[in-house]
């Protein structure tokens, strides 16, 4: 997240104002985050204020440091509710795993150098979360079109040990997000 120091260096001390940074509130502008950082933010929301250092081996206790975020716990329930509604009534409803209460946010990342990127962040299940995820599909357009279904299938595999929604799986596997790519 850019600081005042960053903006003073980038624009000069009198070269920026509130209008310069308003796009930060919707995740645009000079914000640079990795998918791993986005997944960590989902874990922090799912856990109401903490996340564990990402690790490759779940039995590696040396790597499981707990990090807390400086957000008052009273704010998490409303964020959780809003993210749950994405799957119940919003852009994620077509990708909901049956019988799993899910939370997430679809997004479209503007790309000045080509087609927009498809983004999804989320966690499941809503109660007692087991997985937090972030998926970015470059040059693929809307988050609900590509990143949300891919995330949903990955979460389903993780939670259930299999993917039962073969139609969605086949669609993802057999499709391309790049119209320049020819199918064999």
Show where each model-derived region lies.
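Beta-lactam-recognizing serine transpeptidase/beta-lactamase-like catalytic domain environment
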Residues: 1-140, 176, 181-184
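Short, charged, low-complexity patches
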Residues: 38, 143-148, 152-155
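Short, gly/Ser/Thr-rich active-site loops of penicillin-recognizing serine hydrolases
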Residues: 62-67, 150-184
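Active-site-proximal flexible loops/turns
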Residues: 112-114, 145, 163
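Intrinsically disordered, low-complexity acidic/polar segments
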Residues: 130, 142-144, 161
